[in-house]
Amino acid sequence: MLKSTDVRLIINNRIKSFTGIAQDRIQWTNQPNFKIPLEGLWCRVTIQYSDSQSAGFFTETLERDYGIISIQCFARKGTGDAALIALAQAWRDHFHHYRNGDFEVTMTNAPTEAMDDVQGDFVMSLVRVEFRVN
């Protein structure tokens, strides 16, 4: 049975194996000293858990966890969105049907069309990767 620390390692390793953008352009959750690039694309990755459910009773209860990896891809306003959408699609392809032991991606949502970011300097495309553990 995988624990949350095991799952985090699996997800982190999968993100690190992505070659669609340089790793120094990926902002991780609670990453210190990340600098938003002045030019070009960059991404922000967050991992959120949702409900847990009892999936079976053997010698102990098996808990099945669910979660979402949110990958926000950013481009500065006025630079076009073709490369942005292509990057988001590459992330989707990278996670599509990915499985590692008891970790399984159950759905990769199509990237959203580019939309304004709340900061106002960027347009963003979002990829949601839904997963199940155990």
Regions found by a protein language model. Name each.
Residues M1-T61, T79, A90, Y98:
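Small/polar-rich, solvent-exposed N-terminal microdomains that initiate assembly or binding
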Residues A22, Q89-N134:
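Acidic-leaning, charged glycine-interspersed low-complexity segments
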Residues F57-R64, D117-G120:
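Short, solvent-exposed beta-strand/turn "edge" segments of beta-rich domains on protein surfaces
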Residues L62-K77, V123-N134:
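Oligomerization/assembly interface segments of phage tail-like spikes and tubes
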Residues S70-A90:
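Mid-chain, well-packed structural core segment of small domains
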